[in-house]
Amino acid sequence: MGLRAAHTGFVVLVLLQSCAAYKLICYYTSWSQYREGDGSCFPDAIDPFLCTHVIYSFANISNNEIDTWEWNDVTLYDTLNTLKNRNPNLKTLLSVGGWNFGSQRFSKIASKTQSRRTFIKSVPPFLRTHGFDGLDLAWLYPGWRDKRHLTTLVKEMKAEFVREAQAGTEQLLLSAAVPAGKIAIDRGYDIAQISRHLDFISLLTYDFHGAWRQTVGHHSPLFRGQEDASSDRFSNADYAVSYMLRLGAPANKLVMGIPTFGRSYTLASSKTDVGAPISGPGIPGQFTKEKGILAYYEICDFLHGATTHRFRDQQVPYATKGNQWVAYDDQESVKNKARYLKNRQLAGAMVWALDLDDFRGTFCGQNLTFPLTSAIKDVLARV
């Protein structure tokens, strides 16, 4: 009896360890609060047991010091970090930068010793004051000249976190978001060097295709399509992951991005297959109100009366209705991606973003909140 109980306990321990082995990094965007009606999302909508890490996007930098961006950021910080009262194992990070921040602003700060030092010194007290467990650097698309400055910034930030933790507090986490395009990686990131100082890297394995290409195509294919032109051979998650590993990113620090949004296009003709011409981005969603992009919960609405298809080679779906063509991820495709990253022995998955998933559970007809993120979690939790 004692042996059986001990064995059962061991099995339970192994299961818990295997579940904890994979990270599920989930971004929340502060501007989602401004969406109308059921599209409005606040941090208290987040299930505290869904993700291992939640990253709040974005913080600003003012006078070379980390700062809030939204008028009510401090309130939302508190709401988010209160989730840890229900799940003490949840880690929260604050992401600084983002697409709208501008690479030049980062460059200006990182390239000068004094401004870089001022920024770095401002981070730990800010994170501690507001209850965060770490910082996520979202310096997107640095240039050739920025590469060594980014490396120095990461190295010195990590050193500051180590120094600050000597007072007896748990060391702050440091992560970075890195675009998945080969050209962007080559131009701005010394992957081997920054990997040494980061706790994990979120690889943005989406936005491989958009309306700027003048034709339809999927923004987040897992694999290269059979009909892809040679110029598109790098534009898939499999290539990006393999390339990052080849450059020296340790698999146990690499997190693969999975989008909960779709890319939409307005067709220019009756053609709907790969390479069909477009006249521009798709019409804005009811809640996100941005041309060419739809939240998953808006896609669920779009699918009523639409014709759905699946790229078998790329392992991702798309749908057509009238002159609208929408590439997206569904539960099947995100599960395939989660299985893939497990096979590659990566650190886990990243989701952009919780507020673009069906966070209310009312749009997609399953009576399930966060259906895409939950599907990823289910696969990661399996032994």
From Swiss-Prot:
Q: Where does chitin bind?
A: E70, W71, G97, G98, W99, N100, Y141, L204, T205, Y206, D207, R263, W352
Quote the protein name from its UniProt record. Chitinase-3-like protein 1
Q: Which organism is it from?
A: Bos taurus
Q: Recite the UniProt keywords alphabetically.
A: Antimicrobial, Apoptosis, Cytoplasm, Disulfide bond, Endoplasmic reticulum, Glycoprotein, Inflammatory response, Lectin, Secreted, Signal
The protein's matches in Pfam families, at most eight in alphabetical order, are given as:
Glyco_hydro_18
Disulfide pairs?
Answer: C26-C51, C300-C364
Cite a single GO MF annotation: carbohydrate binding
Gene symbol here is CHI3L1
Cite a GO CC annotation: extracellular space
One GO biological-process annotation of the entry reads: response to tumor necrosis factor
